[in-house]
A protein has these predicted regions:
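Conserved GTPase G-domain signal focused on the G5
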Residues: 16-17, 153, 177-179
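Long, charged, low-complexity intrinsically disordered regions
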Residues: 1-6, 166-179
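Short, surface-exposed amphipathic charged segments that create phosphate/polyanion-binding patches used
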Residues: 75, 128-130, 178-179
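Nucleotide-state-sensitive switch-loop elements of NTP-binding domains
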Residues: 2-10, 15-123
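Phosphate/Mg2+-binding loops and adjacent switch elements
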Residues: 85-165, 169-172
Length: 179
């Protein structure tokens, strides 16, 4: 059909994926009138309101089951909606291989992989689900730790990511909005 730029926003439940997508869509540099399809693989804490979607020429397609995400599904979305780009809000509990199999079989062209991490739970995830966490970091172009505070061990987190992906950019955002 046609090459379809895709931005993968990946992380565990309530790690800030929807918030990042909403903030990105509302930025002038990104909101240039292109039609954006948001594929969501979970229902999180933050919802996409109708006004924001209209303002940013965006729409949401919810995928209830991973089995529903197929090359036929993607091609059907292209035929029915004619999006200019796709933002994929992907749950960190799902296998990335399943997603990449479909990406490789379709016109989706992965432009950027962003991983969001709730810094207040990152230590727990690193201890209990290290392999899943590291899998996300391996593919990431950008890792954003949000909800940071004075006790966030930024150096340790940065080293963990750089050990598996030296090219990844790592950013930290404080919960209180301070620099």
């Amino acid at each position: 059909m046609y090459e379809l730029p895709a931005y993968l926003v990946w992380g565990f439940l309530e790690s800030g994926k929807s918030t990042l997508i909403k903030e990105t869509l509302n930025q002038d540099y990104f909101n240039d009138g292109e039609k954006t399809m948001i594929l969501t693989f979970e229902e999180g804490e933050v919802e996409y309101d109708k006004e924001m979607l209209e303002k940013t020429n965006s729409f949401v397609v919810n995928i209830e089951n991973m089995e529903d995400f197929t090359k036929e599904f993607v091609r059907g979305c292209q035929r029915n909606y004619y999006p200019d780009r796709v933002m994929i809000e992907y749950n960190g509990m799902y296998s990335i291989d399943d997603l990449m199999d479909v990406v490789d079989e379709t016109d989706l062209e992965l432009y950027q992989v962003i991983v969001t991490v709730d810094a207040s739970t990152a230590d727990l995830y690193l201890k209990n689900m290290k392999s899943m966490f590291m899998e996300m970091f391996k593919m990431a172009d950008l890792v954003i730790f949000n909800r940071c505070d004075d006790n966030t061990n930024m150096g340790s987190f940065r080293r963990s990511i750089k050990a598996v992906n030296p090219r990844a950019q790592v950013g930290f955002e404080r919960a209180d909005g301070k620099e």
